[in-house]
Amino acid sequence: LKENPNMCAYKAPSLDAREDMMIREVPRVGKEAATKAIKEWGQPMSKITHLIFCTTSGVALPGVDYELIVLLGLDPSVKRYMMYHQGCFAGGTVLRLAKDLAENNKDARVLIVCSENTAVTFRGPSETDMDSLVGQALFADGAAAIIIGSDPVPEVENPLFEIVSTDQKLVPNSHGAIGGLLREVGLTFYLNKSVPDIISQNINDALSKAFDPLGISDYNSIFWIAHPGGPAILDQVEQKVNLKPEKMNATRDVLSNYGNMSSACVFFIMDLMRKKSLEEGLKTTGEGLDWGVLFGFGPGLTIETVVLRSVAI
C-alpha cells in the first residue's frame, strides 16, 4: 500500500497496480490451498482430470487457472474452466459444475480452487458511499480447494460429503440488489439494504424444492453450510426458517474468524464442520446428521442450493 497510495484513496485510478498484484497472488495462494487438498486426498496429481478455478480478483489471459497448472505441475491435458467475477454465490456454482463433470466423465477427478483477495476492492472510506464501507468491514482474503469425483476407490479415497443435488435460482425482482463494476479505481460494488429481506423471503422456496423430494420438512434436522454474507442475512434466515441458533455455528465461526471470503467461504465452513464433528465424536461429518444444505448467495440476486449427504466417521 505504501508503494501504491492510490489504493488507499477513495476512487483514485489504481487498476493497473491492483491487477498486477492479483495476477501474481491469486494463483500463488490458490496453489497453497490446492497442495493441502491434494495431500489429504492422497492420490498422485496425474489423476486430476479437470480444474475449476474461481476468483473475483484479477483478470488475465491465458488466466490464473493456467498459472495454477504451471505452479502445481499438473498434466497439460487437464481440462480447465475459469470462472471470473461470479461473487459470493459461486461456492455453490463450482460444486454444481464439478458434480456434472464427475458424473459424466469416467474416472474424472475435478480439482476446485477458489482464491479471493480483497486488494481488488480495497480503498479508503467516504461518507457518501456506505456500501463500500460495509464491504471493507465484511470482506476478507481466503483460498480453498477440494477434489470431487464419482465412485471413490475403496480404502484409497475417503469421501467427506456426497453431493446429492444442485440448483440455481435468479430471484425475481431482485435486479440491482448486489452487483459490481470493474473500473479504473478497481472493483466497485453495491449492496442494497434489502438483501437480507430478499434472501430470507426466498429461502423457504429453495429449501422446499431441494428437500420435498426427500420427505424432509424439518430444517433443524439437517446440517447447514450457508454462505455468511453478513450477520443480518444469517439472522433473518434463522428467523424465517425457525432455526435453532446452533445450526449456524460453523457459519458464524467462519464469518467471525475469517470474514466473508466470497466463493471460498462455504469450503471453510465445510472443513470446520467435518473437523469439529470428528473432534466431538459424532457419527457423521455433518454434525452427526445425515442430510444437509449448502447455500450460496450473491449478485443477481442469485441463490445456489446444494443438497449434501454426510459420511460416517
Curated annotation (Swiss-Prot):
One of its GO terms (biological process) is polyketide biosynthetic process. Pathway: Phytoalexin biosynthesis; 3,4',5-trihydroxystilbene biosynthesis; 3,4',5-trihydroxystilbene from trans-4-coumarate: step 2/2. It catalyses: 4-coumaroyl-CoA + 3 malonyl-CoA + 3 H(+) = trans-resveratrol + 4 CO2 + 4 CoA. It is found in: Cytoplasm. This is Putative stilbene synthase 2. The active site is at C88. It comes from the Eukaryota. It is an enzyme of class 2 (transferase). The keyword Signal does not apply. GO terms for molecular function: trihydroxystilbene synthase activity. Keywords: Acyltransferase, Cytoplasm, Transferase. Its main location: cytoplasm. Belongs to the thiolase-like superfamily. Chalcone/stilbene synthases family. Substrate binds at L191, G229, G230, P231. PROSITE patterns: CHALCONE_SYNTH (PS00441). The keyword Cytoplasm applies. Its EC number is 2.3.1.95. PANTHER family: CHALCONE SYNTHASE 7, HYDROXYMETHYLGLUTARYL-COA SYNTHASE. Homodimer. One of its GO terms (cellular component) is cytoplasm.
